[in-house]
């Protein structure tokens, strides 16, 4: 129902005004039908080879579909909450009933528009009402009253609210205000009329400038919506350029420093922290030797304008440069070098001079994070990618928050990335401290690995026995399937039989998981882009592959002992010590090649998938709960475990001692060829399902335990999860909830120049108050 309203709104506004874009959506029912159709196609051949061979892949796809369905349900719940809020607001202010349906009058609509989140803000409520003059309200009401009845129905209110929630709402409002005759185009006369009424008449705007002539030609060209939005962007630069010329009375290329600060402060395409705004006039100090101590040159004016547009980007550059140079502060050359290597922003030496002049508080020629944060009010740890940095400023700081992008977008929470975590590391740690930290992480990884292995060990035993079953004749097979194997082990060997060989497993899994997690972390940190908190995907896979390779030298000897203990069912039992003596040092590494073929691809698939799942499951604050981590680990284990099953089967066959009359193998190739010849390709996927059901929860439990143990046992230690993928989860509620329509109008006026100086002009005409 809600989605239908949105689509109706889009169609209505497309027809009435202009195209708002096409949103392609797939309903949940279509999604389910598609899934069912696929299942029906595959269901007719349940006993076929391909289904059995790739059964784990099917499980992985099913899990992916279930995850997608869950995400769709989450979005649906969010939409229901929004609709509920819209209904509550409408019912609160709608005072008229027509034909049995509640309706809003113009006064009701005005009250609804100017309502803030808190009813306690009644003073601001009245200010918003006062700021919405008759002309602007008329435009808004006409936009909402689609059927021209003079009243607003609930459906119309929802449509209007949906439109105002769009990121381009401010452009849309500006377009409607400029389009005086409502024909969907902006003429040069429309443009001149609004701009003339909006700007300060004491600084006339030259409508015969090159910019206006390029857009409107000889005056007969009219602009559609898209063309108009580009004009609004370019208009800002033209305004300040003309204002500079106006204040340059003697054509000297300099203007008074107070006029310089006023002109730059009048443009609302950026955020200007109060500390920076107050220091803009001090830029004139750089001209003491040139004979213009109280003036600012045009080159400085242009450089300062560019600099103010990119303050958050400079914060990222500073952070990356300090990490790269391993120093607490950097000089101009180091800053410029990092800026050119890590950003697409072209920074000039003059801009560098201005940056250090404004932000270098102690004037030592070096810039530190502390200097930057004190000068700007920015929290440098919260600076992420993109152009909207509202959350980078502390809530109690006195910072003028202005849109930093020419395309308006709702503020989104920006969470810490791996680079931000790395930035929090204390510089100058002693070697002993670093060693202690590594030991702590290793110990936690060992304990977590043991917990994960013990939780799923019975499944591992069943998997090993199924893979080792070599008889081709069904009559000679000891186990029909994994479930039959499980039942027979419990029946003939007892519950304790399910845990045969667990001691070597516990001894081996601790260093295995600890080494794997530690190496993966180390390589991700080495390969990653610290300035952005990101890692190139092929390098991410490479890090996982090396992590898997690093564990084999330690775990292969213990695993071969474990496997030989697991396959002992009846008859005389052989101890682990006896097995070790029998094999010798060389024998303990039997099957190591197959082990590498299994573990390297497994880790190369698992760790990037786990990192990606963490980003998907993170909440609006970028945080994950224990169940989120468990699910991320479990889902990542599905493709990783299933796709490397053939290597695991070969490894098991090579490491198990063949009984009398059973086939023996001389190596990986020999084993592979004999299995294909004697048992068929399906034998390469024996135990695939058990492996999936073992590996997925095992690694999920391991990683959850790792992170929870670190929080519980080392709460004051630096938090370092097994994978440090950056989390950038957008919050749907924030996108919808922090938007007030009247505030949109005010922001639009400030941004695009419409009615920008009107309030000051009114004050001047009403008694000359606040002439400054």
Swiss-Prot record:
Solcar repeat windows: 436-526, 535-616, 624-712
Protein location: Mitochondrion inner membrane
Region (N-terminal domain): 1-377
Tagged with keyword Ligase: no
GO cellular component annotations of the record: mitochondrial inner membrane; mitochondrion
Transmembrane segments: 442-459, 501-520, 545-558, 591-610, 630-647, 687-706
Biased segments, Low complexity type: 763-772
Signal peptide: none
Role played: Mitochondrial and calcium-binding carrier that catalyzes the calcium-dependent exchange of cytoplasmic glutamate with mitochondrial aspartate across the mitochondrial inner membrane.
Comment on protein domains: Upon calcium binding, the EF-hand-containing regulatory N-terminal domain binds to the C-terminal domain, opening a vestibule which allows the substrates to be translocated through the carrier domain. In the absence of calcium, the linker loop domain may close the vestibule, which may prevent substrates from entering the carrier domain.
Further comment: Binds to one calcium ion with high affinity.
Name by which UniProt lists this protein: Calcium-binding mitochondrial carrier protein
Phylogenetic placement of the source organism: Eukaryota, Amoebozoa, Evosea, Eumycetozoa, Dictyostelia
């Amino acid at each position: 129902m809600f989605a239908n309203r949105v689509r109706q709104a889009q169609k209505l506004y497309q027809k009435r005004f202009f195209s708002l874009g096409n949103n392609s959506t797939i309903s949940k029912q279509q999604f389910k039908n598609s899934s069912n159709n696929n299942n029906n196609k595959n269901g007719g051949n349940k006993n076929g080879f391909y289904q059995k061979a790739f059964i784990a892949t099917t499980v992985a796809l099913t899990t992916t579909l279930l995850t997608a369905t869950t995400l769709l349900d989450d979005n649906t719940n969010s939409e229901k909450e929004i609709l509920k809020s819209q209904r509550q607001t409408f019912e609160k202010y709608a005072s008229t009933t027509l034909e049995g349906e509640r309706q809003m009058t113009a006064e009701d609509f005005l009250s609804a528009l100017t309502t803030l989140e808190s009813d306690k803000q009644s003073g601001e409520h009245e200010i918003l009402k006062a700021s919405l003059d008759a002309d602007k309200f008329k435009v808004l009401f006409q936009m909402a009253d689609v059927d021209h009845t003079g009243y607003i129905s609930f459906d119309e209110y929802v449509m209007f609210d949906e439109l105002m929630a769009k990121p381009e709402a401010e452009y849309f409002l500006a377009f409607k205000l400029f389009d005086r005759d409502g024909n969907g185009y902006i003429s040069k006369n429309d443009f001149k009329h609004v701009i003339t009424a909006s700007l300060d008449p004491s600084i006339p705007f030259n409508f015969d400038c090159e910019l206006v002539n390029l857009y409107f030609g000889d005056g007969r060209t009219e602009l559609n919506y898209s063309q108009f939005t580009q004009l609004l962007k370019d208009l800002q630069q033209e305004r300040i350029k003309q204002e500079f010329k106006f204040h340059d009375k003697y054509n000297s290329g300099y203007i008074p420093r107070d006029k310089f600060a006023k002109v730059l402060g009048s443009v609302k395409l950026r955020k200007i922290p109060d500390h920076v705004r107050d220091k803009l006039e001090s830029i004139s100090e750089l001209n003491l030797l040139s004979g213009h101590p109280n003036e600012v040159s045009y080159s400085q004016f242009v450089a300062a304008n560019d600099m103010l547009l990119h303050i958050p980007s400079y914060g990222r550059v500073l952070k990356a440069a300090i990490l790269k140079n391993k120093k607490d502060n950097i000089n101009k050359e180091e800053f410029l070098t990092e800026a050119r290597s890590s950003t697409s922003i072209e920074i000039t030496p003059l801009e560098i001079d201005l940056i250090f002049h404004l932000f270098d508080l102690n004037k030592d020629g070096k810039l530190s994070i502390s200097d930057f944060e004190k000068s700007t009010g920015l929290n440098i740890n919260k600076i992420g990618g993109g152009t909207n940095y509202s959350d980078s400023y502390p809530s109690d700081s006195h910072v003028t928050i202005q849109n930093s992008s020419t395309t308006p977008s709702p503020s989104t929470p920006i969470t810490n990335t791996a680079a931000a975590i790395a930035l929090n590391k204390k510089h100058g740690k002693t070697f002993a401290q670093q060693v202690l930290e590594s030991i702590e992480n290793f110990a936690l990884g060992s304990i977590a690995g043991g917990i994960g292995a013990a939780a799923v060990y019975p499944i591992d035993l069943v998997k090993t026995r199924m893979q080792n079953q070599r008889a081709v004749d069904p009559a000679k097979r000891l186990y029909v399937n994994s479930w039959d194997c499980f039942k027979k082990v419990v029946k003939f060997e007892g519950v304790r039989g399910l845990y045969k060989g667990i001691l070597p497993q516990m001894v081996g899994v601790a260093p295995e998981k600890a080494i794997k997690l530690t190496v993966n972390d180390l390589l991700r940190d080495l390969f990653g882009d610290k300035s952005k908190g990101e890692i190139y995907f092929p390098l991410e896979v490479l890090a996982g592959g090396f992590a898997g390779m690093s564990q084999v030298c330690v775990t292969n000897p213990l695993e071969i002992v474990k496997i030989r203990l697991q396959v002992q069912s009846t008859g005389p039992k052989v101890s682990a010590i006896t097995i070790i003596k029998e094999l010798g040092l060389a024998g303990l590494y039997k099957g190591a090649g197959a082990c590498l073929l299994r573990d390297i691809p497994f880790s190369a698939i698992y760790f990037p998938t786990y990192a990606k799942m963490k980003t998907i499951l993170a909440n609006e604050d970028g945080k994950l709960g224990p169940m989120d981590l468990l699910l991320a680990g479990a889902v990542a284990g599905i493709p990783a475990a299933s796709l490397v099953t053939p290597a695991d089967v070969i490894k098991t066959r090579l490491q198990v001692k063949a009984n009398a009359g059973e086939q023996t193998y001389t190596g990986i190739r020999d084993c592979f060829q004999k299995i294909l010849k004697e048992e068929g390709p399906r034998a390469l996927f024996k135990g695939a399902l058990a492996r999936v059901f073992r590996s997925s929860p095992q690694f999920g439990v391991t990683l959850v335990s790792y992170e929870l143990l670190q929080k519980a046992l080392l709460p004051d230690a630096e938090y370092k999860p097994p994978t440090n993928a950056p989390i950038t989860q957008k919050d749907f509620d924030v996108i919808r909830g922090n938007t007030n329509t009247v505030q949109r109008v005010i922001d639009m006026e400030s941004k695009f120049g419409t009615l920008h100086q009107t309030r000051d002009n009114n004050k001047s005409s009403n008694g000359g108050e606040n002439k400054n």
